[in-house]
C-alpha cells in the first residue's frame, strides 16, 4: 500500500513555474520538451506574467516554485544567472540614423517615449539614470507588440530587450543603445531551501539550454 501511495505521489508531482511572457514564449517550450524527456511523470504548471516584479512576489508568497525573470532586488530568492539581454532602441523606419548601428541614450532626451507596460520601466530608468537622460515618458497599458506598432506609426520611440522585440520588427528599426545596456535574465527559487530532485533536473535542463545563447543574436 505504501508503495502504491509513493508511486501515486510521484505521478502527481507538479512544479509551478512563473515566467515573463517573452521567456514563456521563446524559452519554455524547448526547456519543457527536454525536461519531459527525463521526468515524464512530473507535471508542470506554467504561469505567464507581464509584470516585472510579479514572479518574485509569487515566489515570496509560496505560490510558485520556480521563476524565470530579470534580476531584481529580492533577497529571499536563490538566483541563477542565465543570459544577458541587450536593450534596443525601437525607432520608426524613417528615423534619421544616418548609417549608425547604435543609438546613443542621450538621444532619448526630450523625445516622446512610449514606456512599455509591466514595470519594464525599472530597466529603462536604470539605463536613463546612468546616462543622465530624461525622456518625455508616456506609459501605455498595452502589450509589447502594440507598443512596437505604435512606434511604427510615428507615435513615439521606445526601448525594449531582445526577447521582447523578437519577431515583431518589420515596421520599425531596432538598434542597440549606447553605452551598452543589459538586463540579466535568470532562474529563481526559494532561498535556503533544498530543491526537490525534479527541480534540480529542471535547472540542469535550463542551464544546458541557455549555454547555447552565448554570442547568439535574437
Please identify what each model-predicted range represents.
Residues 14-18, 67, 90, 114, ...:
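Short, well-ordered beta-strand segments
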Residues 97, 111-132, 195-203, 213-218:
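Secondary-structure junction motif
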Residues 12-74, 141:
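Central regulatory/effector-binding core of bacterial HTH transcription factors
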Residues 78-88, 139, 162-163, 170-184:
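Short beta-strand->loop
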Residues 8-9, 76-87, 91-113, 196-197:
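Flexible hinge/capping segments at coil-to-helix
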Residues 50-55, 60-63, 119-173:
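Hydrophobic hinge/microswitch elements
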Residues 1-8, 206:
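Alpha-helical linker/hinge and terminal dimerization helices associated
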Residues 173-218:
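A late-sequence structural motif
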Amino acid at each position: 500500500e505504501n508503495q502504491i501511495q509513493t508511486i501515486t505521489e510521484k505521478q502527481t508531482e507538479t512544479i509551478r513555474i512563473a515566467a515573463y511572457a517573452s521567456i514563456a514564449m521563446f524559452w519554455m517550450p524547448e526547456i519543457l520538451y527536454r525536461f519531459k524527456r527525463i521526468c515524464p511523470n512530473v507535471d508542470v504548471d506554467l504561469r505567464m506574467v507581464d509584470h516585472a516584479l510579479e514572479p518574485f512576489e509569487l515566489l515570496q508568497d509560496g505560490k510558485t516554485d520556480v521563476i524565470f525573470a530579470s534580476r531584481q532586488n529580492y533577497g529571499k530568492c536563490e538566483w541563477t544567472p542565465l543570459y544577458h539581454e541587450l536593450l534596443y532602441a525601437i525607432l520608426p523606419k524613417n528615423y534619421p540614423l544616418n548609417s549608425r548601428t547604435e543609438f546613443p541614450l542621450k538621444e532619448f532626451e526630450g523625445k516622446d517615449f512610449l514606456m512599455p507596460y509591466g514595470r519594464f520601466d525599472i530597466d529603462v530608468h536604470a539605463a536613463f539614470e546612468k546616462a543622465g537622460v530624461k525622456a518625455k515618458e508616456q506609459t501605455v497599458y498595452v502589450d509589447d507588440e502594440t507598443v512596437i506598432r505604435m512606434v511604427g506609426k510615428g507615435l513615439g520611440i521606445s526601448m525594449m530587450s531582445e526577447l521582447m522585440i523578437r519577431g515583431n520588427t518589420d515596421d520599425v528599426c531596432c538598434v542597440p543603445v549606447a553605452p551598452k545596456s543589459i538586463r540579466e535574465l535568470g532562474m529563481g527559487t526559494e532561498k535556503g531551501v533544498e530543491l526537490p530532485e525534479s527541480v534540480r533536473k529542471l535547472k540542469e535542463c535550463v542551464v544546458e539550454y541557455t549555454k547555447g545563447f552565448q554570442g547568439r543574436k535574437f
